[in-house]
Amino acid sequence: MIIIPARLKSSRFENKVLEDIFGLPMVVRCAKNANLVDECVVACDDESIMQTCQKFHIKAVLTSKHHNSGTERCLEAARILGLKNDERVLNLQGDEPFLEKEVILALLEATKNAPFMATCAKVIDEEQAKSPNLVKVVLDSQNNALYFSRSLIPFLRDFDAKRQTPLLGHIGIYGFHNKEILEELCTLKPCVLEDTEKLEQLRALYYQKKIAVKIVQSQSVGIDTQEDLENALKIFSPNLLER
């Protein structure tokens, strides 16, 4: 099951999930991409998102407005849907309308093999890495996440030295091995790291839970601001979304 948490009043760009992406609302684009891989449900926090999804025949459930993270909203949706404890759950974003089907499939495969949870990352350049909106991740020898940060990591101390490891940009999608894992993560007490960086995935690392990271090729960009949307609409074409 794929669940897309969708919040109307995003702090940096209100109503962004309803913004038009080549003739379809953003959240509908995201759901249509997800439905190419598995059954998808949008976890809404507002009736306007529900109505939009229903208009385009996208399955949706109404959840609380008071969740602290998309993961918590996913869990409520999973409970509403009555998912079995052993069912695999993917958490995709409602602001990634250009996410490729191949990336979702890669996440699904990684989740099958991950004992706790999985996510994806892509190689980025130094200029991209400077943006705090693009989260960076560093990995251990088994491609599990060591840390996620809005800062540039790993930091290259010797500026004239050649970088030995690629810079990896996190793609904010998650796979939980089963619903029980999702339940477990949400019962853990929030930690200071996730509050400092405003990155919910740091809770898992803080409590020594493994996050497997699949490195993928992707041109997708998250839409965090009005400027992001305007830039994305210049870069992408409608033809790329017709799959």
Swiss-Prot record:
Principal EC category: transferase
Cellular component GO terms held in the UniProt record: cytosol
InterPro entries in the record: Cytidylyl_trans, KdsB, Nucleotide-diphossugar_trans
SUPFAM superfamilies referenced in this protein's UniProt entry, alphabetically: Nucleotide-diphospho-sugar transferases
Key words, A-Z: Cytoplasm, Lipopolysaccharide biosynthesis, Nucleotidyltransferase, Transferase
Pathway: Nucleotide-sugar biosynthesis; CMP-3-deoxy-D-manno-octulosonate biosynthesis; CMP-3-deoxy-D-manno-octulosonate from 3-deoxy-D-manno-octulosonate and CTP: step 1/1; Bacterial outer membrane biogenesis; lipopolysaccharide biosynthesis
Pfam families according to UniProt: CTP_transf_3
GO molecular function, one term: 3-deoxy-manno-octulosonate cytidylyltransferase activity
Superkingdom of origin organism: Bacteria
GO BP terms in the entry: CMP-keto-3-deoxy-D-manno-octulosonic acid biosynthetic process; lipopolysaccharide biosynthetic process
Catalytic activity: 3-deoxy-alpha-D-manno-oct-2-ulosonate + CTP = CMP-3-deoxy-beta-D-manno-octulosonate + diphosphate
Subcellular location: Cytoplasm
Enzyme Commission number(s): 2.7.7.38
Role, per record: Activates KDO (a required 8-carbon sugar) for incorporation into bacterial lipopolysaccharide in Gram-negative bacteria.
Similarity comment text for this entry: Belongs to the KdsB family.
Protein name: 3-deoxy-manno-octulosonate cytidylyltransferase
Gene expressing this chain: kdsB
